[in-house]
Amino acid sequence: MIATAPDERINRVSRTPSSLARERMLSRRGEPLFLADWMRVLMIHFEVDASELQRVVPYQLDLHDERAFVSLVAFTMENMHPRLGGKLGAWLFNPIATHDFLNVRTYVRHNGEPGIHFLAEWLSSWLAVQLGPRTFGLPYRHGRICYQHDLEQGCLVGRVEDVKRGNHLKYRAEAVLGAPFAPCERGSLDEWLMERYTAFNAVGHTRRFFRVWHPPWPQCAAQVKLEDLSLLQDNWDCFKEARLVGANFSPGLHDVWMGRPHCA
């Protein structure tokens, strides 16, 4: 599925989070900055204690029915390149164009705009880890990551190890073979968790945000077995009493729009 711009018919249908995100993205000149493919995406959702979580988040939490959530997003980013620059730009970005991610994100609202805040992001690319904090204010960490997200073979397995500390995340997941991939039901908790398009982050006293855009996630429900949570429990107290509430798998999206960093 290609994240190409929808035509004018989008103005004649109900306003989805995706359509609103596209409007916000294009309200700034020069956007988007990058394009990339976000592939074989597994999102695992936890409910956590809101007051415990708020202590480590520099933005106001966005709650759903007074409940706070943290999600893990395990995926492979492929073919990241500047929107402009053609083959030369793609060649220059080749060393960091493709790598695995584990995002640990929570849900915030800033100046009336819903978004996410990354508690941490583990990347398999050492070079990308050096660049992210300097440019986007992102909390990158280096990880040894092994994903086998092959739904057709019934295999959704992941292992992430922090290179410095050695703690792990290990999981196995299942989804119904042949289940249709479709956007989340409008107004559902799944939509609230998955359809987020602005990232608010901070380094020291400097707050930044950037926006992304893509069509609504094509997804299906997944069932997850967590085998090792030390990567999370050793870093955040709120995970010691966290409750697994669900998971979603998506085959991914091509040509996701990724915006520039801005002051929040």
Segments predicted by a language model, with ranges:
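Hydrophobic, proline/glycine-rich low-complexity stretches
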Residues: 2-85, 213, 217-264
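Internal, well-folded beta-alpha domain core
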Residues: 39-41, 103-264
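Structured, non-membrane catalytic/scaffold regions adjacent to prosthetic-group chemistry
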Residues: 25-26, 32-150
